[in-house]
């Protein structure tokens, strides 16, 4: 750290997200960014592109992130709030360069992904590291501190409880008491799910744990303990590659066949109503339920709920003051601020290779790369802002 930058100081917040097309002309270039390096045929991209075109070729995610950024500016007056994406403008590389040019020294990074996985956590650390590595040599390298995972924070859980209760009220009265709570999240290849977290299988275990906590919260409001289900959506890739199951549409059909009277579909794995919610749940899953006569309602996402926005401020304060108590509602406890080098390593990359990559980055003086990959604070090195 420098003499002018006190320990724990944070002088900006970076909102980090996936990105999405702003209009029809953006759809295919965006999808090419998402699938870069995977040799996905154009015919498959065209199929997915049609889903976006159903909504005017514009992802709802962007406007929702703009709204979240504005809410965060109101919640954190005096702290500049920036926004950067992995796959579309504003790109992280451009935003981090803007921050560095503005003199930002240490920024907290809030990623709109609550759970452990390569694509939902570690890959964002890699994206941040790449953005630092791409900075022009004339710019000092800011320190980027990714905020901890928030899947079991009350600021995420409590709004989801309220949204489940509201969705139950949308069901026909005779279906409300015995309705199932069908929690959903983005499916992952089994190999990636098994590698999630420091000891493996963190992604499905976190989802299950917080689903039970939310269901208990619903019970406190309604007096009814609803059956809890966990299903997945948005599967892609070759059919021969196993992914997390069951599919949400398949599970709705199974529930109807088993005599269920209704279900609330809860988009637990998403913080806003982006395309996976708008298409995979509101169109595909709803169609499957209608085909078998199962009444369903879809719970809302947290969006810009004031409790969720206040949670981000609380996570920033945890970085500013590591001695603050950290709130969490599952047996996982508050997720660590730092991730181990072997956490969420993609199956194609061994833990030894990942650790060596982090070590090599640190040895070359690229402090930002190592800090982001491992999730470390890096202030103890006394090398903040160095670039060699």
UniProtKB/Swiss-Prot annotation:
Q: Which UniProt keywords apply?
A: Cytoplasm, Heme biosynthesis, Iron, Lyase, Metal-binding, Porphyrin biosynthesis
Enzyme class name: lyase
The record ties this protein, via CDD domains, to: Ferrochelatase_C (cd00419), Ferrochelatase_N (cd03411)
Renumbered to this chain, region (Disordered) spans 349-369
Recorded GO MF terms: ferrochelatase activity; metal ion binding
Q: Which EC number applies?
A: 4.99.1.9
Identify the residues that bind Fe-coproporphyrin III: 59, 124
The biological pathway it contributes to is: Porphyrin-containing compound metabolism; protoheme biosynthesis
Query: Where, by residue number, does Fe(2+) bind?
Result: 186, 276
- UniProt-listed Gene3D superfamilies: 3.40.50.1400
User: What InterPro entries is this protein classified in?
Assistant: Ferrochelatase, Ferrochelatase_AS, Ferrochelatase_C, Ferrochelatase_N
Q: Which compartments does it reside in?
A: Cytoplasm
Recorded catalytic reaction(s): these are: Fe-coproporphyrin III + 2 H(+) = coproporphyrin III + Fe(2+)
Give GO cellular component annotations, separated by semicolons: cytoplasm
Indicate the family of this protein: Belongs to the ferrochelatase family.
HAMAP family found in the cross-reference section: Ferrochelatase
Q: Which NCBIfam families match?
A: hemH (TIGR00109), PRK00035.2-1 (NF000689)
Protein's job = Involved in coproporphyrin-dependent heme b biosynthesis. Catalyzes the insertion of ferrous iron into coproporphyrin III to form Fe-coproporphyrin III.
Q: What is this protein called?
A: Coproporphyrin III ferrochelatase
Q: Which organism is it from?
A: Frankia alni (strain DSM 45986 / CECT 9034 / ACN14a)
